[in-house]
């Protein structure tokens, strides 16, 4: 409710205002601004609303677990589920690999994080925590690119299945398109499955930028292969808890994947890898990708496809802007992240997808 003060200036009596927004709508001078909360602005799938008590609530039927609200909340009021204690317990019980081998599967976007140290020192830090081996999720991306290119050629149209938030969005908002989602596991799950099948006493921890991976790890199709998920922020917390200064450590080597597997971390990288997969396998297919950078771009592409007006035969869907390098669990969201991922890709020893996956055969 508006009142007039001693200076004849209108102000809003907060004790009576119910925040209906009507005054903002009728003010001809736009002197009253109706502001959304940061979490609401961040949520592009409209899963966050205000209840009658003006408290923010999350509609789990709309939430895709992308973590945008977690990242954008300036008060730290929204938290994703953490498996840090589970990981600490797994590290302790592994007894430095004597009880079982604990594998750290690191997402390729790690190349753009921990910019105060060298990547090789981060790998050494993981081993200092008690991990037996560090493996690139990008090798799983090479596996996916190889298989997904064949699947695309067979079916004629496909959407990617690497981003769990994107797949959840299709399931919730475009269920009629679910049959068009690639049947391949994500890179995380693909490489974890290989590890579990070849090393019976292995346990796997995925470390990456993505909060939605925590939900993916609970799916029946993925749960047997992934024991826990950590974000880069949580990994930094583990280093801090051990007073581990990784800048003092020697550099270890990470050399499992190809250039194409590594660039999965940024928008457009998946499509480039699928194109390379088609080329390397001599598959005659005219790839027309629709690269969706962010969930709003995904929505537009899926809407066009649902109306049969999309001029593309492959949708690369990434819920976070920039791709995985824009994930909510990242330590940094800088402009240099894409360049760092591309540099990391160029440094790969394996120059083709076939070179990378040959060690698996």
What are these regions (language model features)?
Residues 74, 79-361:
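Iron-sulfur-associated redox domains of electron-transfer enzymes in respiratory
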Residues 19, 65, 187:
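Short, glycine/acidic-rich beta->alpha junctions
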Residues 14, 40, 70, 123-124, ...:
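Short glycine-/small-residue-rich flexible loop motifs, especially phosphate/cofactor-binding loops
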Residues 16, 32, 62, 114-117, ...:
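Charged, low-complexity surface patches
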Residues 1-11, 22-59, 64, 68-84, ...:
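Iron-sulfur cluster-binding cysteine motifs and their immediate structural context
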């Amino acid at each position: 409710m508006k009142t007039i003060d001693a200076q004849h200036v209108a102000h809003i009596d907060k004790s009576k205002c119910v925040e209906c927004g009507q005054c903002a709508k009728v003010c001809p001078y736009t002197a009253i601004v109706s502001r959304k909360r940061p979490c609401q602005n961040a949520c592009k799938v409209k899963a966050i609303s205000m209840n009658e008590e003006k408290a923010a609530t999350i509609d789990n039927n709309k939430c895709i677990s992308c973590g945008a609200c977690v990242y954008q909340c300036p008060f730290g009021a929204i938290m994703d589920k953490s498996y840090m204690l589970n990981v600490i317990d797994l590290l302790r019980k592994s007894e430095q690999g004597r009880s079982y081998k604990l594998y750290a599967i690191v997402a390729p976007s790690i190349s753009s994080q921990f910019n105060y140290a060298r990547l090789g020192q981060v790998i050494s830090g993981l081993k200092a925590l008690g991990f037996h081996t560090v493996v690139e999720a990008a090798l799983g991306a090479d596996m996916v690119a190889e298989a997904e290119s064949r699947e695309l050629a067979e079916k004629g149209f496909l959407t990617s299945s690497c981003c769990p938030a994107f797949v959840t969005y299709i399931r919730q908002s475009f269920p009629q398109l679910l049959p068009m989602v690639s049947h391949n596991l994500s890179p995380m799950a693909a490489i974890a499955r290989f590890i579990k099948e070849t090393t019976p006493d292995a346990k796997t921890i995925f470390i990456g930028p993505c909060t939605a991976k925590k939900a993916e790890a609970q799916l029946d199709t993925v749960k047997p292969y992934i024991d826990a998920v950590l974000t880069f922020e949580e990994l930094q917390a583990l280093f801090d808890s051990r007073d581990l200064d990784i800048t003092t450590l020697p550099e270890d080597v990470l050399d499992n994947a190809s250039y194409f597997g590594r660039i999965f971390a940024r928008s457009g990288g998946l499509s480039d890898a699928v194109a390379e997969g088609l080329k390397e396998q001599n598959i005659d297919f005219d790839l027309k990708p629709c690269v969706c950078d962010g969930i709003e771009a995904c929505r537009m592409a899926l809407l066009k496809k649902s109306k049969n007006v999309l001029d593309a035969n492959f949708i690369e869907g990434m819920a976070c802007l920039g791709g995985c390098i824009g994930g909510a669990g990242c330590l940094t969201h800088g402009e240099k992240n894409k360049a760092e991922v591309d540099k990391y890709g160029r440094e790969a020893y394996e120059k083709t997808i076939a070179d990378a996956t040959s060690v698996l055969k």
